């Protein structure tokens, strides 16, 4: 029996996080990301989340920052119907690998967002650096820029004092 369960457990472990394993903030971030994705004019078909590969949230004074990496696949529904439960994933439909960075305040209002979902074959290394920079800007949304200090930030001021 164990010989049958071990491959199943290993297979499920490599599939990424399930939607049930996401925190409340991560669920809200995923919802905001899907809404944002389906707003874009080039998107004609509804897409469905096939896996969540990475999910992290960080609490800041201005709110909660959520970073999600997930995969989408095209369904048989038009984009206006993306919320419908009966939309089936097309076996040969387009696939997208997404990075979403969402900043939520204490009332679940969106302070900042960045959603990037290129077609999976178009993912390039240069874009990853630009996405990380955009994600960092979203992470700092609503924060006081003077609430934290970097090492050595005041070293020159003290050195110039008599």
From Swiss-Prot:
GO MF entries: signaling receptor binding
Gene3D superfamilies named among the record's database cross-references: 3.10.450.10
BP-aspect Gene Ontology terms: cell differentiation; chemotaxis; inflammatory response; innate immune response; positive regulation of chemotaxis; positive regulation of fat cell differentiation; positive regulation of protein phosphorylation; regulation of insulin receptor signaling pathway
UniProt key word Secreted: yes
Cellular component, GO, one term: extracellular space
InterPro entries hit by this protein: Chemerin, Cystatin_sf
Cellular compartments annotated: Secreted
UniProt entry keywords in alphabetical sequence: Chemotaxis, Differentiation, Disulfide bond, Inflammatory response, Secreted, Signal
Disulfide bonds: 77-87, 98-117, 101-135
Signal sequence residues: 1-20
RNA-binding as UniProt keyword: no
Residue numbers covered by the propeptide annotation in the UniProt entry: 156-162
Description of post-translational modifications: Secreted in an inactive precursor form, prochemerin, which is proteolytically processed by a variety of extracellular proteases to generate forms with differing levels of bioactivity. For example, the removal of five amino acids results in chemerin-157, which exhibits the highest activity, while removal of six amino acids results in chemerin-156 which has slightly less activity. Some proteases are able to cleave at more than one site and chemerin forms may be sequentially processed by different enzymes to modulate activity levels.
Domain of life: Eukaryota
Free-text function comment from the UniProt entry: Adipocyte-secreted protein (adipokine) that regulates adipogenesis, metabolism and inflammation through activation of the chemokine-like receptor 1 (CMKLR1). Also acts as a ligand for CMKLR2. Can also bind to C-C chemokine receptor-like 2 (CCRL2), but with a lower affinity than it does to CMKLR1 or CMKLR2. Positively regulates adipocyte differentiation, modulates the expression of adipocyte genes involved in lipid and glucose metabolism and might play a role in angiogenesis, a process essential for the expansion of white adipose tissue.
The protein's name: Retinoic acid receptor responder protein 2
Source taxonomy: Eukaryota, Metazoa, Chordata, Craniata, Vertebrata
């Amino acid at each position: 029996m164990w010989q049958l369960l071990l491959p199943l457990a290993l297979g499920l472990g490599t599939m990424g996080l399930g939607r049930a394993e996401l925190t409340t903030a991560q669920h809200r971030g995923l919802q905001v990301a899907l809404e944002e994705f389906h707003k874009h004019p080039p998107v004609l078909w509804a897409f469905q989340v096939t896996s969540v590969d990475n999910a992290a949230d960080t609490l800041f004074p201005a709110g909660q920052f959520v970073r999600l990496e997930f995969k989408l696949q095209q369904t048989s529904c038009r984009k206006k119907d993306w919320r419908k439960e009966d939309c089936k994933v097309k076996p040969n439909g387009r696939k997208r690998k997404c990075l979403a960075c969402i900043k939520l305040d204490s009332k679940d209002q969106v302070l900042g967002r960045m959603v990037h979902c290129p077609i999976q074959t178009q993912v390039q290394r240069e874009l990853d650096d630009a996405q990380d920079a955009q994600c960092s800007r979203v992470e700092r949304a609503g924060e006081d820029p003077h609430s934290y200090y970097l090492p050595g930030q005041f070293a020159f001021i003290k050195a110039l004092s008599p």
